[in-house]
């Protein structure tokens, strides 16, 4: 057992409470400390950039959209998925104020941050489940920017719908933007966020990986049983909005997080990313993930 805490960096794509809560709980309530780890969360916007930092050694692990992870691995990025984290697609499609239903989007424009991102996937797949086909029924517009920019684009009429996270949705609902549908419910059980590390880390520090996953798993169990205690700790930091919002986020996500990962989850990601042919060439689903560390971490509770 290491006596001095080892410092490791975790990249996260989002500064939101829902995006970082599993790491915050594991750090603040001593679960990383019990593994002699000191974890710093580094905000890196965009999955591809976060994974480039991982490959370059700037960070040790990254929380990233599952579809972005399998796409990078299919392009020979030297990394693997080591765990699930959030098997729930945290997106709701919100409309401009003159849009009242999904069918009102026919002939309209849906705005997303950029090509190949999870927001684009969420919007296109979610609308497909509702019977609307991209390019036939509506257009996708890239480069609409972050949440405030997308809300502004809805207001100005540049776009007529856009996907927003739970936290963003709470804010925009107050401003009168209509909810068209919850994408997470339309695409259930999808490995939305996963944990990825480099092949170098897998080869050189297997014990650390087991410790990281065990700490996160214990933190998630603690969160489920101690929502109010976690909420109080987060509220004291005064970083994530008003107490009511913090509690709403914790109640929404406490039961959702799970480190669980199965072959079928990775197959769903490969199918969603439409890279079945590339996956086959690379040697199949096993190329994309490893369960050896998760198995050890969850055995040693």
Feature map (PLM): residue ranges:
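Short, glycine-/small- and polar/acidic-enriched structural segments
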Residues: 2-144, 150-156, 160-166, 177-189
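Pocket-lining segment of extracytoplasmic ligand-binding domains
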Residues: 67, 146-238
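Conserved C-terminal helix/tail region of periplasmic/extracytoplasmic solute-binding proteins
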Residues: 273-301
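Secondary-structure end/capping motifs
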Residues: 203-281
């Amino acid at each position: 057992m290491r006596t001095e805490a080892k410092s490791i960096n975790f990249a996260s794509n989002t500064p939101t409470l829902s995006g970082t809560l599993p790491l915050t709980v594991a750090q603040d309530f001593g679960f990383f400390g019990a593994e002699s780890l000191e974890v710093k969360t580094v905000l890196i916007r965009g999955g591809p950039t976060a994974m480039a930092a991982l490959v370059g050694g700037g960070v040790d692990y990254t929380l990233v959209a599952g579809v972005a992870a399998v796409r990078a691995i299919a392009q020979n990025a030297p990394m693997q998925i080591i765990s699930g984290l959030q098997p729930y697609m945290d997106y709701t499609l919100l409309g401009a104020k003159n849009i009242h239903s999904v069918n009102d989007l026919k002939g309209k424009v849906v705005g997303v941050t950029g090509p190949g991102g999870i927001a684009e996937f969420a919007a296109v797949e979610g609308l497909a489940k509702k019977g609307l086909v991209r390019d036939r029924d509506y257009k996708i517009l890239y480069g609409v920017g972050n949440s405030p920019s997308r809300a502004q684009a809805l207001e100005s009429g540049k776009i007529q719908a856009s996907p927003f996270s739970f936290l963003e949705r709470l804010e925009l609902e107050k401003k009168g933007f209509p909810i068209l549908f919850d994408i997470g419910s339309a695409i259930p059980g999808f490995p939305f966020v996963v944990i990825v590390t480099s092949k170098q880390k897998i080869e050189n520090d297997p014990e650390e990986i087991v410790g990281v996953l065990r700490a996160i798993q214990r933190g998630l169990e603690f969160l489920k049983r101690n929502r109010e205690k976690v909420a109080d700790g987060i509220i004291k930091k005064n970083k994530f909005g008003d107490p009511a919002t913090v509690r709403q986020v914790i109640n929404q996500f406490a039961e959702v997080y799970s480190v669980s990962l199965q072959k079928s989850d990775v197959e769903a990601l490969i199918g969603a990313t439409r890279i079945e042919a590339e996956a086959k060439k690379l040697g199949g689903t096993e190329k994309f993930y490893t369960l050896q560390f998760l198995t050890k971490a969850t055995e040693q509770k």
